[in-house]
Amino acid sequence: MDKQQDQQQEARPVLEGPDIARVLTRIAHEIVERAKGADDVVLLGIPTRGVFLARRLADKLEQITERKMPVGSLDITMYRDDLRMHPPRALARTEIPGDGIDGRLVVLVDDVLFSGRTIRAALDALNDIGRPRAVQLAVLVDRGHRELPIRADYVGKNLPTSLRETVKVQLAEEDGRDTVLLGAKPAAPGAHP
């Protein structure tokens, strides 16, 4: 058995498919309530899993409001503050809905909120694209450990973790199943348990 399989066995599910569907439905209702109808809402997912979550959220919002929700994606690769430390990833696509974001309520959608650095990069990228009326954040999981003063407006599950734990979101579109796994980080090479 390889290390990744061993790690998968140690991880325990904290959300499964029906739970994820339920929290997305709740978040959709919260968006409609807070936006007073969601007429000017634009959803932008942060690749990769944030894009899938944004599309699912758009479907839920369409069921509630009976109108098509603009949904797109926001690539933050070139806005990351760790480009010097890690090799660059492949660029994802930024897709802004036809009506743009100027004067609209943009809801950024991501899978896990951790340090806040991804969202800071997303705000920088958004600033280069246009001037929304307001920006809100929806996340499937908030695991804490913020390094920047950023908080989510809509949270599927607050999951306090230690820095020695990992949170892995798996979605059917990318991974073949819907689950959120909480596991232990692998020990550093040469470290003793």
Swiss-Prot record:
Q: Does the keyword Glycosyltransferase apply?
A: yes
Location of the motif PRPP-binding:
106-118
Q: Which reaction does it catalyse?
A: UMP + diphosphate = 5-phospho-alpha-D-ribose 1-diphosphate + uracil
Residues at which substrate binds: 48-49, 89, 93, 110-118, 143, 167
Keywords from the named record: Glycosyltransferase, Transcription, Transcription regulation, Transferase
What is any one GO biological process for this UniProt entry? regulation of DNA-templated transcription
* GO MF term list: uracil phosphoribosyltransferase activity
Which cysteines link up through disulfide bonds?
none
- Which Pfam family is one of those matched by this entry? Pribosyltran
User: Which EC number(s) does UniProt give?
Assistant: 2.4.2.9
SUPFAM superfamilies membership: PRTase-like
General function of this protein? Regulates the transcription of the pyrimidine nucleotide (pyr) operon in response to exogenous pyrimidines. Also displays a weak uracil phosphoribosyltransferase activity which is not physiologically significant.
Q: Which family does it belong to?
A: Belongs to the purine/pyrimidine phosphoribosyltransferase family. PyrR subfamily.
Name under which the protein is recorded:
Bifunctional protein PyrR
Source organism of this protein record: Streptomyces coelicolor (strain ATCC BAA-471 / A3(2) / M145)
